[in-house]
Amino acid sequence: MTFIEEFIYKGYLHQCTDLDQLTAITQEVKIAAYIGFDCTATSLHIGSLMQIMILRLLQKHGHTPIVIIGGGTSKIGDPSGKEVTRKALTQEDIKRNTAGIKKSLSKFIKFGKDQGDAIILDNAEWLDSLNYLDFLRDFGRHFSVNRMLTMDSVKLRLERSHHLSFLELNYMLLQAYDFYYLSKHYNCILQLGGSDQWGNIVIGADLIRRISGKEVFGMTTPLLTTASGAKMGKTAAGAVWLNEDLLSPYDYYQYWRNCEDADVIRFAKLYSELDIIELNKFEHLVSEDINAAKKQLAYELTKLCHGERLAKLALETAVRIFEQGDIDENLHTFILAPEILQAGISAYKLFYNVNLARSKSEARKIIRGKGAKINDQLVEDENMTIDTNFLLDKKVIKLSVGKKRHILVKV
């Protein structure tokens, strides 16, 4: 398959400015294409995973992926998809977050100076030195405020009478300038992003045509949710981070292992590099095969993110916990102050304190519903006192909620 054919097959395509022409160009020559990431956290999470897999796909087909870290634009904040103004980031925040995002990306993409290697740039390199008056004179006249106000990211805020600062309105101008800069200095002809970026991408492509007469393209990916409608990248316990200092490889594995049955085939196409033969097997699964497919999916995706060794360790840990009933120290661990167990703590409070319940009342409800276990024994009394007598040989207490949520409490 060509790049565009595989792009469509895997389910990445939502919109394209001129798909036929872009298809023809990518079949004739190798192109440079870019995706931007703002520095809003110290790691990317799986909400960005589709964009990362697209960068890998570009590299696979011999095209040059360009990654833009938004060290400059993060000082403003993208209003796309947001109903409120984002909190401003300090220079220290941006520096710390940039390092973490580079770590996330380096798990998946080969950066370097050889042909086909990905390029990583920080748009602060050119945005920080922009002269405002020169920018207004040379570029401001090419932007239509009328058109900007029709963009979904702006229109949503205005329709709901939510505050939209002039600073945020400038975000799309700077993103358009990013595209222009990359087109001029790196011969980049394609910008990719989520569906909420369509307006910003089109404005950038239009700016390039007006100034240089060059034809460039934009493509967006669909907004992804799980089969039940939950937003990708978020769980009740928090974000599904790519960096292991924020989420263990085991917990990453378990997220994919516990995905909904209806999502298995789609996730395999979107996020794995299984070949077509393997993917076709996924499409013809019968109900009794679904758990085996989930294990394979979880293993493949964990291997992509954390490497083969840690993926195997996560798989082995899951087998011991769920299929053999052993306690494994690679399970997620919560450190409890020794004096708490020495004094004793009610069972429902312990489940709440280690984040297995969102509130004390929920913890009580779980126990009353026969959904809580301590050291694999059902908890009958929500008020029973848990103390040092519950510590096992490894000086841990195993807490479980249902069949899939487990934690080791250490003192």
Curated annotation (Swiss-Prot):
Sites where the protein binds ATP: 234
Keyword Heme attached: no
Source taxon at top rank: Bacteria
GO molecular function: ATP binding; RNA binding; tyrosine-tRNA ligase activity
SUPFAM superfamilies: Alpha-L RNA-binding motif (SSF55174), Nucleotidylyl transferase (SSF52374)
Main location (coarse class): cytoplasm
Domain S4 RNA-binding residues, every copy: 345-411
Its job: Catalyzes the attachment of tyrosine to tRNA(Tyr) in a two-step reaction: tyrosine is first activated by ATP to form Tyr-AMP and then transferred to the acceptor end of tRNA(Tyr).
NCBIfam families membership: tyrS
HAMAP family per record: Tyr_tRNA_synth_type1
Name of the protein in its database record: Tyrosine--tRNA ligase
Species whose genome carries this gene: Rickettsia typhi (strain ATCC VR-144 / Wilmington)
Name of the gene encoding the protein in the UniProt record: tyrS
